[in-house]
Swiss-Prot record:
GO-annotated molecular function: NADH dehydrogenase (ubiquinone) activity
Matching Pfam families: NADHdh
Chain segments annotated as coiled-coil in the UniProt record: none
Function: Core subunit of the mitochondrial membrane respiratory chain NADH dehydrogenase (Complex I) that is believed to belong to the minimal assembly required for catalysis. Complex I functions in the transfer of electrons from NADH to the respiratory chain. The immediate electron acceptor for the enzyme is believed to be ubiquinone.
Protein known as: NADH-ubiquinone oxidoreductase chain 1
Membrane topology field: Multi-pass membrane protein
Predominant cellular place of this UniProt entry's protein: mitochondrion
Length: 324
């Protein structure tokens, strides 16, 4: 009984609570970074240096009255934000930090499959709102996410050829001698840009378009359901950056000081997340046709060529003697 309680309740909570705390402070960091890049302070009133601002925001959102449009689908309208957050939390299960909560043989495919399911929560929330603005925003979001998942899948295919397995832990063994960032530099650049688009971040934030007159699929949401969608979005940002660090930025295991494994991975993921915020502060929004042109006419041919190259190269050199 105690063992079941530990594995089914305490272990998942030990993952979920720190992720949600990290999400809360990522929002504060984003507002601070944007503030300083626009020559102002950012939040600095609530608590010392504004550190309690995310908690105040969370409490404010969850005690607001949940307004549901009278014409909206009652069940789907509330289920889709919960689905979005559930998927965002489940995605962390196979991540080696340094040990995964579930040890899957096909961890990479699990992450790819579940991140694809997030499309349904976006489409469902846009459709259930029964608003033309929400539906148009949802359709744009779905088209963008599906398009960039193609390039993400092909880039992962190439990296899997590099490390020779679908288990996320095998990256440690592969990258002990050399970070994959160096031999797979074009892949890393395309992967990072694709994760920006996949998580609907600037300059690819056409789905939300906060500065526009009507934002995207979440236009009808307020209070608690909006907070759930918001948490899911930022949890996905942290997940994608942690995955980028795992794939390209070397083994998190340090043989000399094994205690620093988690800190090593967290530092790399945090630095990649800060670059996400820098990009948001620096670049204007893409036009929709440019967004699609980038993935279908630039990334897709290049990733296909690299998949063929990485498949053919080991076979071509297999006949050479090892001492060469």
């Amino acid at each position: 009984m105690l063992n079941t309680l530990l594995t089914h309740l305490i272990n998942p909570l030990a993952y979920i609570v720190p992720v949600l705390l990290a999400v809360a402070f990522l929002t504060l960091l984003e507002r601070k970074v944007l503030g300083y890049m626009q020559l102002r302070k950012g939040p600095n009133i609530v608590g010392p240096y504004g550190l309690l601002q995310p908690i105040a925001d969370g409490v404010k959102l969850f005690i607001k009255e949940p307004i549901r449009p009278s014409t909206a689908s009652p069940t789907l309208f509330l289920v889709t934000p919960m689905l979005a957050l559930t998927l965002a939390m489940t995605l962390w299960a196979p991540m080696p930090m340094p040990h995964p909560i579930i040890d899957l043989n096909l961890g990479v495919l699990f992450i790819l499959a579940l991140s694809s399911l997030a499309v349904y929560s976006i489409l469902g929330s846009g459709w259930a709102s029964n608003s033309k603005y929400a539906l148009i925003g949802a359709l744009r979001a779905v088209a963008q996410t599906i398009s960039y998942e193609v390039s993400l899948g092909l880039i992962l295919r190439s990296i899997i050829i590099f490390w020779g397995g679908y288990t996320v832990q095998t990256f440690n063994t592969t990258q002990e001698a050399l970070w994959l960032l160096l031999p797979a530099c074009p892949l890393a650049a395309m992967w990072y840009i694709s994760t920006l688009a996949e998580t609907n971040r600037a300059p690819f934030d056409l789905t939300e378009g906060e500065s526009e007159l009507a934002p995207g699929f979440n236009v009808e949401y307020a209070g608690g359901p909006f907070a759930l969608l918001f948490l899911a979005e930022y949890a996905n940002i942290l997940l994608m950056n942690t995955l980028s660090a795992i794939l390209f930025l070397g083994a998190s295991h340090m043989p000399a000081i094994p205690e620093l494994t988690t800190i090593n991975l967290m530092t790399k993921a945090a630095l990649l997340s800060v670059v996400f915020l820098w990009v948001r502060a620096s670049y204007p929004r893409f036009r929709y046709d440019q967004l699609m042109h980038l993935v279908w006419k630039n990334f897709l041919p290049l990733t296909l060529a690299l998949v063929l190259w990485h498949t053919a190269l080991p076979i071509a050199f297999a006949g050479l003697p090892p001492q060469l």
